[in-house]
Amino acid sequence: MLSIRVDEHKPFDISLRNFKRACEKAGIKQELRDRQHYVKPTEKRKIAKRQAVKRARISQRRAFI
């Protein structure tokens, strides 16, 4: 469970920003997106392979320049 301590002397906006940052670090937003619908294991592997190829192409371009 994620919790943020709210200080009475600080504005609410700062506490809200800290909460959003903590949620981002914990990966809550990404996990919710992943759980919205089921993805088959084969589809996960295909996506991972596509991303690896894309990263390799980008690294090759950067190394070439």
UniProtKB/Swiss-Prot annotation:
GO CC entries: ribonucleoprotein complex; ribosome
GO BP: any one term: translation
MF terms (GO), sorted A to Z: structural constituent of ribosome
InterPro entries associated with the record: Ribosomal_bS21, Ribosomal_bS21_sf
Keywords (A to Z) from UniProt: Ribonucleoprotein, Ribosomal protein
UniProt keyword annotation of Lipid biosynthesis present: no
Membrane spanning stretches: none
Family note: Belongs to the bacterial ribosomal protein bS21 family.
The protein's name: Small ribosomal subunit protein bS21A
Organism: Francisella tularensis subsp. holarctica (strain LVS)
Gene: rpsU1
